[in-house]
From Swiss-Prot:
Cytoplasmic-side segments: 1-12, 62-74, 113-129, 211-355
Species per Swiss-Prot/TrEMBL record: Mesorhizobium japonicum (strain LMG 29417 / CECT 9101 / MAFF 303099)
Disulfide bonds: none
Gene Ontology terms for molecular function: cAMP binding; identical protein binding; intracellularly cyclic nucleotide-activated monoatomic cation channel activity; potassium channel activity; protein-containing complex binding
Residues that bind 3',5'-cyclic AMP: 297-298, 307-308, 348
Pfam family, one: Ion_trans
GO cellular component, one term: plasma membrane
Assembly mode: Homotetramer.
Intramembrane region spans per record: 162-180
Protein name, per record: Cyclic nucleotide-gated potassium channel mll3241
Motif (Selectivity filter): 175-180
Superkingdom classification of source: Bacteria
Stretches in topological domain Periplasmic: 31-38, 151-161, 181-185
Length: 355
């Protein structure tokens, strides 16, 4: 029996298997654990290691067959998950060999889409992040210097040098404040208050830069996906890039579960829809099913008449909607859009009449 189907079953279980494995690694560090319990935990680690070995074999076979390509990071994680514990078991005779199974921390990240996004965010925001980090370093040294000057005679054992004062500066800038080092003078306490406020501002800058970067990355991905969808719609294929950008910016995402009614016949319509994923069923005398790239509901925007058919989700469907207010703005700024919609409405009305 081929092991190739195993990968499809196993891939979602990376985190599920890693969790008990890492808990077993932690439990094996308890000094007074009985020998039987240690043996059971070691057996559990061996079972998980065997599962990871099968996954590695499946991945390599799929890659050799050409089914999977460009998965070097995933394969590297699979190789490390197998070889590192094996090498530790064979070469390290001490009970600490199980600690090397901590490499399984990488397994839940194997199929994650978060870290590629994080990498792009860090690359895009590198200049701003480096700038804030530089500011942090400057403030850190300045605070340590000030604390050294103010407190060195009062607490020479804690502020007797700038490196010693830097520990207090770090924990105070991060607003952690362990309490092991506290300024005794009035000037030192005023400095501590100012440093805490500065730390909040600096960490707020870091958080704001990363949050903005993630938001822009998600928006960029949505924009590209929506652009590809809109550009593939025959209705818009003759429009220029500038007009397409306006349309994409006006679209709003919506997900509808299977069987749900999207619009009913006779209802007033205030938007049209584009199908991104899934399919919808149009209840006409000759029922029609529309898939990705199709659109419906444009008649209500053009003529203002009620819905001419009931449309429901044949499967779970992702839609992009264009509201009437946005539609009117687009038509006023780009008359060619209004003309394209008008011609399409006439064609569909004629086709419906002939049917």
């Amino acid at each position: 029996m081929s092991v190739l189907p195993f990968l499809r079953i196993y891939a979602p279980l990376n985190a599920v298997l890693a969790a008990p494995g890492l808990l077993a690694v932690a439990a094996l560090t308890i000094p007074d654990m009985s020998g039987r319990s240690r043996l059971a935990l070691a057996a559990l680690l061996a079972v998980i290691w065997g599962a990871y070995l099968l996954q590695l074999a499946a991945t390599l076979l799929k890659r050799r067959a050409g089914v999977v390509r460009d998965r070097t990071p995933k394969i590297a994680i699979d190789v490390l998950a197998v070889l590192v514990p094996l090498a530790a078991f064979l070469l390290d005779g001490s009970p600490d060999w199980s600690l090397y199974c901590a490499v399984w921390l990488l397994k839940p990240l194997r199929d994650s889409t978060f870290f590629p996004v994080l990498g792009r965010v860090l690359a895009n925001e590198a200049r701003n992040l480096i700038g804030v980090t530089t500011l942090f370093g400057v403030v850190l040294f300045a605070v340590a210097l000030a604390a050294y000057v103010i407190e060195r005679d009062i607490q020479p054992e804690k502020f007797g040098s700038i490196p010693q004062a830097m520990w207090w500066a770090v924990v105070t800038l991060s607003t952690t404040g362990y309490g092991d080092t506290i300024p005794q003078s009035f000037a030192g306490r005023v400095l501590a208050g100012a440093v805490m406020m500065s730390g909040i501002g600096i960490f707020g800058l870091w958080a704001g830069i990363l949050a903005t970067g993630f938001y822009q990355e998600v928006r960029r991905g949505d924009f590209v996906r929506n652009w590809q969808l809109v550009a593939a719609v025959p209705l818009f294929q003759k429009l220029g890039p500038a007009v397409l950008v306006e349309i994409v910016r006006a679209l709003r995402a919506r997900t509808v579960p299977a069987g749900a009614v999207i619009c009913r016949i006779g209802e007033p319509g205030d938007r049209m829809f584009f199908v991104v994923e899934g399919s919808v069923s149009v209840a006409t005398p000759n029922p029609v099913e529309l898939g990705p790239g199709a659109f419906f509901g444009e008649m209500a925007l053009i003529s203002g008449e009620p819905r001419s058919a009931t449309v429901s989700a044949a499967t779970t469907v992702s839609l992009l909607s264009l509201h009437s207010a946005d539609f009117q703005m687009l038509c006023s700024s780009s008359p060619e859009i209004a003309e394209i919609f008008r011609k399409t409405a006439l064609e569909r009305r004629g086709a419906a009449a002939s049917a």
